[in-house]
Amino acid sequence: CANSCSYGPLTWSCDGNTK
């Protein structure tokens, strides 16, 4: 994962990638 990570309601995305 990159330094910037965003957490969504159901899924989390890192550096524009969803996992």
Curated annotation (Swiss-Prot):
Post-translational modification: Maturation of lantibiotics involves the enzymatic conversion of Thr, and Ser into dehydrated AA and the formation of thioether bonds with cysteine or the formation of dialkylamine bonds with lysine. This is followed by membrane translocation and cleavage of the modified precursor.
GO biological process, one term: killing of cells of another organism
Keywords: Antibiotic, Antimicrobial, Bacteriocin, Hydroxylation, Lantibiotic, Secreted, Thioether bond
A GO term for molecular function: signaling receptor binding
Residues with PTM (3R)-3-hydroxyaspartate: D15
The organism's place on the tree of life at top rank: Bacteria
Crosslink site: Lysinoalanine (Ser-Lys): S6-K19
Protein family: Belongs to the type B lantibiotic family.
Function: Is a potent inhibitor of human phospholipase A2. Exhibits only a weak antibacterial activity against B.subtilis, and does not display antimicrobial activity against S.aureus, S.mitis, E.coli, K.pneumoniae, P.vulgaris and C.albicans.
Protein name, entry field: Lantibiotic duramycin C
Organism from which the protein derives: Streptomyces griseoluteus
Source species taxonomy: Bacteria, Bacillati, Actinomycetota, Actinomycetes, Kitasatosporales
